[in-house]
Amino acid sequence: MIGSRYVKGGSLDTEWGWERKLLSWWANRVYIWLILRATTHDCTGGFRVWNRYVLEGIDRRRIKSNGYIFQAEMAYVTERLGYSVFEVPIHFAERKRGQSKMSLRIQIEAALRVWQVAWRHHALKPADRQVPVSRQVQQ
């Protein structure tokens, strides 16, 4: 399950400037979609709840990303392996403390890493799921 800012009922804090809103929307709904063809509406949001069997079905050695792109890579791999991604609307509130880590360098790195994710996982299919240890014991 993914908490999404970009499904019906989802929203962003009114304190976000239009530039930040546009960058986030464009990254999720245009750029990532064009490269990965991911059906997930909010690939970069951090509100996630994972089913144990989905996590066990992903070969974690394949996941190379960290930071913002980690969220997109996990959503993409989940979709490529044929698992369902369920999105629920969330309100994304402005932080009360601290500073954003989203520098220009991080934006460029994230944009380039989307291509790496596409290249690394484009051939994944449901048959590539790992057999969960918990299910191996039951058989």
Please place each PLM-identified region on the residue numbering:
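Catalytic donor-sugar/metal-binding loop of nucleotide-sugar-dependent glycosyltransferases
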Residues: A38-T39, R62-N66, A75-A93
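Generic recognition of well-ordered alpha-helical segments
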Residues: R29, V77, A110-V114
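Hydrophobic alpha-helical segments
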Residues: W18, L23, S65, V85-E87, ...
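Hydrophobic aliphatic residue packing
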Residues: M1, V54, V85-I90, V114
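Acceptor/aglycone-binding surface of glycosyltransferases and processive sugar-polymer synthases
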Residues: M1-Y68, R95-I108
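Short, hydrophobic alpha-helical packing/hinge segments within bilobed ligand-binding/sensory domains
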Residues: G46, M74-A75
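Terminal low-complexity segments of carbohydrate-biosynthetic enzymes
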Residues: Y53-V54, R80-G82, L112-Q139
